[in-house]
Amino acid sequence: MSIHIVALGNEGDTFHQDNRPSGLIRTYLGRSPLVSGDESSLLLNAASTVARPVFTEYQASAFGNVKLVVHDCPVWDIFDSDWYTSRNLIGGADIIVIKYNVNDKFSFHEVKDNYIPVIKRALNSVPVIIAAVGTRQNEELPCTCPLCTSDRGSCVSTTEGIQLAKELGATYLELHSLDDFYIGKYFGGVLEYFMIQALNQKTSEKMKKRKMSNSFHGIRPPQLEQPEKMPVLKAEASHYNSDLNNLLFCCQCVDVVFYNPNLKKVVEAHKIVLCAVSHVFMLLFNVKSPTDIQDSSIIRTTQDLFAINRDTAFPGASHESSGNPPLRVIVKDALFCSCLSDILRFIYSGAFQWEELEEDIRKKLKDSGDVSNVIEKVKCILKTPGKINCLRNCKTYQARKPLWFYNTSLKFFLNKPMLADVVFEIQGTTVPAHRAILVARCEVMAAMFNGNYMEAKSVLIPVYGVSKETFLSFLEYLYTDSCCPAGIFQAMCLLICAEMYQVSRLQHICELFIITQLQSMPSRELASMNLDIVDLLKKAKFHHSDCLSTWLLHFIATNYLIFSQKPEFQDLSVEERSFVEKHRWPSNMYLKQLAEYRKYIHSRKCRCLVM
C-alpha cells in the first residue's frame, strides 16, 4: 500500500549546515521518526541532473511498510507548459501541500490569481494543507480601512492565508522556522493524521472488494481485462529563452545600434526585446512618455545613460539604407558602454543570470567599485515604475522563472502597433507584429523575411487558410511561449497553423490539449458530443501529427462500444478499422463470455454479480 503526496510552491531558500539546499518536505522526511530510510536514499531525481527540474521525487517507507511517494514542485511552470503531467499529479494525490514564503507577497498573489483556480478544478476530495513558512519581516501595523487591508505591507498576512485555505477547504498552518517543533510536531502531526486517514480509506476499499469477491461461490463471471495502455505523449522542451538569445547573435531585423561616447559602433539590438524587459528603453524609444511612467528614477536613468542621435552628418549615415535605418543611440557612460555587450547578452538570456553577468563584468573592470556601479545601473534599467527596486537581492531574483519578464511583457506588444514593422492581413482585418520576434521563434518566418521573397520587402502580408482567432493564438505562442485554446476545435485549427509554419513544440502542446480534453470527458458526454472523432483523426494524419493520430486510434478502440454506434465510424479506412477491431475494448471474446454467463444466471434464477 502506498501514499502519494504532492507539494506545490516555494517556501524560500533554506539550507543545511553544510550548505546543501533543503526545504519543508525534505526536512520533514529527514527528521520524522515515522519515515525510514537515510536522507541520501530519499532523493530519486537529483536537482543537479537538470538545470531547472519541474519536480523532485522522493520515496521512503512510513509506518513500517507503507510506501511514501512525494513529488515536490517548487515552481509552477508545470501548470503553464504541461497540462497532462500537472493534471495527473493533482488527480493521483492522496494529500496536497501548498507552501509559500510569508515575505514574498508578489509570488503569493501570482499563485492565488493564476494557479489556485486550476488546482480547485482538479481537486478530487483530497485533504489540502496550506503551509505559510517564515517569520514576517518589516511587517507594518494593520490598516483598519476595509478597502486596503489585503494590500497593506510587503508580507502575506495571516488573514490572507486563512482566506486562501477557506477557498480550498484546506488546513492552514504557520511555520515560523523549519525546526523540530514546527516540522516534527506541528506540520508532521497534521500531515501524519491525513496519512492515517488515507490509509484507513484505502484499507476499507480493499476489504470491500475482497468481501465482494468471496461472497459468490458458484460460477464466476468472466474477467474484464484492462484496456491497453494509451500511448504516452512527451512534451517538447521549451527553447524560448535560447530563441531570443540567438536573435542577438544572428543580427537579423536589427532596428537599434549602440555607439560609445567616441561614436564608435558597439553592438546592435532590437527595440521590442529591450522594451519587453525595461521601462527605461520604453521611455528612450517613445513607447511610453514620462507621464505614463511617473517614476523619476527611471527618467533620470534614461537621461544619464543614453542619447538618441539623428544627425545626418553622423559618420556612416550616408551608407544607411534609405527605407528605415536603425536608430542610433549614444551610450554616455563609458564604463557601462564597455560592458554593454555582456549586459545585452544577460537581457536576451532572460535577465536572471546575475552571477554570470557579474563575473563577465569583473573580467573587463578590475575595480570592484566600478563593477558595483555598473551592476546598479543594470538594476535601475530593470526597475518597475513606482516600486522599490526588487532586484537588490540578486540571489532571490535568480530563483524566479527565467522567462518572468518575457512571458508577461512581450504579450503587452501582441497585436499592438507599437514598434510594429510588419502587418498581417487576415479575413479583411489587420494584425500588427514584430519581425524580430517572428524570425527568432519561427524558422519559416525567418526564411520568409530574410530570403528572396516578396514578404522580405513588404510591410503588408496577406495570410490565407487561417482564421484571425487562430492566427492570433499562434502569435500569442510565439510571443509568450504559451497558449490556451478555447476547445478541441480551436486546438486542432491551431495545430494545423503550427504545422503550416513548422513550429513543432506548438503542435505538441495542441496534441496534449486535445488528448487531455478527450480523456476528461465521461462516457455519457462522449456518446452525445457532436465532435466527429474520425474527422479529427483524418486531420491529424493529413497534417503529419503522428502522435495524435496514433493516440486517437487507441482512443476509438478503447471506447469501441460508443464510437462503433456513430455514423462516422464507417468512414474509417480498412487499415484503421482493422486496428480498432484488433485492439477494441471490451474484446469480442469477453462479450460472448458475458452473454453466456448471463444466460446461465437467468437459467439458475441467480442474481448476476456483473449486470
UniProtKB/Swiss-Prot annotation:
Expression across tissues: Ubiquitous. Highly expressed in neural and cardiac tissues, pancreas, placenta and testis.
Effect of N138D: Abolishes ATP-binding
GO CC terms, sorted: cytoplasm; cytosol; extracellular exosome; trans-Golgi network membrane
GO molecular function: ATP binding; ATP hydrolysis activity; GTPase activity; small GTPase binding; ubiquitin protein ligase binding
Localisation: Golgi apparatus
UniProt-annotated stretches for the region Interaction with Rab9: 420-611
Chain positions covered by the region annotation Rho-like: 1-175
Keyword list, A-Z: ATP-binding, Golgi apparatus, Hydrolase, Nucleotide-binding, Repeat, Transport
Source taxon at top rank: Eukaryota
SUPFAM superfamilies: P-loop containing nucleoside triphosphate hydrolases, POZ domain
Any Pfam family matching the protein: BTB
SS bond partners: none
EC number(s) given by UniProt: 3.6.1.-
BTB domain sequence ranges: 254-356, 420-487
Chief location: Golgi
GO annotation (BP), single: retrograde transport, endosome to Golgi
SMART domains, sorted: BTB (SM00225)
Subunit composition and interactions: Interacts with RAB9A and RAB9B (at lower level compared to RAB9A-binding). Interacts with M6PRBP1/TIP47.
Cited function: Rab9-regulated ATPase required for endosome to Golgi transport. Involved in transport vesicle docking at the Golgi complex, possibly by participating in release M6PRBP1/TIP47 from vesicles to permit their efficient docking and fusion at the Golgi. Specifically binds Rab9, but not other Rab proteins. Has low intrinsic ATPase activity due to autoinhibition, which is relieved by Rab9.
Notes on the domains: Although predicted to be a GTP-binding protein because of the presence of a Rho-like region, binds and hydrolyzes ATP. In contrast to Rho-like proteins, the conserved Asp residue in position 138 in the G4 region is replaced by an Asn, decreasing the ability to bind GTP.
PANTHER family recorded: SPECKLE-TYPE POZ PROTEIN
The protein's name in its UniProt record: Rho-related BTB domain-containing protein 3
Lineage: Eukaryota, Metazoa, Chordata, Craniata, Vertebrata
